[in-house]
């Protein structure tokens, strides 16, 4: 389902639905496939509303911590900038969208009632003539930040004046966990691109992809020493460590992650059942 999240009616409905969980005391959202929604849409439609609800119902959370949101911007690439394009990169979503674009936003029902979106196969564009163009125009280079780093060996107050309030899964770091040295080197050189990389959610592998070795469609296939080094870095480095079920035991090492309709689940890296859960660590 491709929801029209640029329509206020749709966005408000989603906020109402998911806001119910915030009212119950849920302390954060992981938003799947966030890269399919523009940063402008997040900054206009969702982040402000969810943040406000989080503040309003903070007493429902046990520790009253700020409501936390992070998303999956799936950038399967070895560099922190995805194919040379800022607006397709994970870090882009951690920065606030330009105010001049936010001011031009019109998601009202009155606007959408004027739009007739014919399918491309029938000669139409398949998109509206304003909101889509507005989202695509949000492609300016991002600033850099020292929020992650100490300055002259000392802690300093971070500057969040340009932060979007949204955080991301650290896909570039995940992709470089073929070995810990590569992951560490990438973070040292690339963390300045995020508003604050200490809030990046870090995992070595997941149910979707393994770290880049020769093919990310397979579970990690290295030895125990290499795996232990990766996990040690994940738990002691900057960011929020995220352990996918099975990672701690080298689950289904080297297995293809997903065969789709071409083979049984038992032959994949997603065989989360029965004896498969014992893992392969000696």
Each language-model region and where it sits:
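Short glycine/proline-rich turn/loop motifs
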Residues: 1-6, 24-25, 204-217
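A broad, structure-centric signal for solvent-exposed, well-ordered loop/edge residues
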Residues: 10, 210-211, 256
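Active-site-proximal helices and loops of the catalytic beta/alpha 8
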Residues: 16-19, 27-196, 200, 217-225, ...
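Active-site-adjacent "subsite" loops/lids of carbohydrate-active enzymes
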Residues: 1-24, 34
């Amino acid at each position: 389902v491709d929801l029209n999240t640029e329509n206020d009616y749709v966005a408000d409905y989603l906020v109402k639905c998911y806001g119910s969980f915030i009212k119950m005391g849920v302390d954060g959202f992981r938003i799947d496939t966030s890269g399919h929604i523009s940063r402008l849409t997040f900054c206009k439609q969702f982040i402000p509303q969810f943040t406000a609800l989080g503040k309003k119902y903070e007493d429902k959370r046990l520790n009253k911590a700020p409501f936390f949101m992070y998303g999956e911007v799936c950038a399967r690439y070895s560099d922190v900038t995805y194919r040379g394009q800022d607006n397709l990169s994970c870090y882009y979503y951690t920065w606030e969208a330009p105010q001049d674009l936010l001011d031009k936003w019109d998601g009202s029902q009155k606007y959408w009632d004027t739009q007739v979106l014919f399918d491309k196969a029938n000669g139409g564009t398949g998109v509206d003539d304003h909101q889509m163009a507005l989202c695509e125009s949000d492609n300016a280079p991002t600033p850099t930040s020292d929020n992650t780093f100490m300055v002259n060996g000392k802690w300093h107050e971070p500057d969040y004046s340009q932060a979007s309030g949204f955080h991301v899964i650290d896909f570039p770091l995940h992709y470089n966990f073929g070995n810990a040295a590569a992951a560490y080197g990438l973070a040292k050189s690339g963390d300045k691109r995020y508003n604050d990389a200490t809030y990046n959610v870090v995992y070595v592998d997941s149910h979707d992809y393994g770290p880049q070795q020769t093919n990310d469609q397979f579970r990690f296939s290295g030895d125990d020493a290499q795996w232990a080094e990766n996990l040690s870095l994940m738990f002691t480095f900057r960011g929020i460590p995220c352990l996918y079920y099975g990672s701690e035991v080298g689950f289904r090492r080297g297995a293809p992650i997903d065969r789709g309709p071409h083979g049984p689940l038992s032959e994949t890296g997603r065989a989360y059942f029965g004896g498969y859960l014992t893992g392969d660590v000696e």
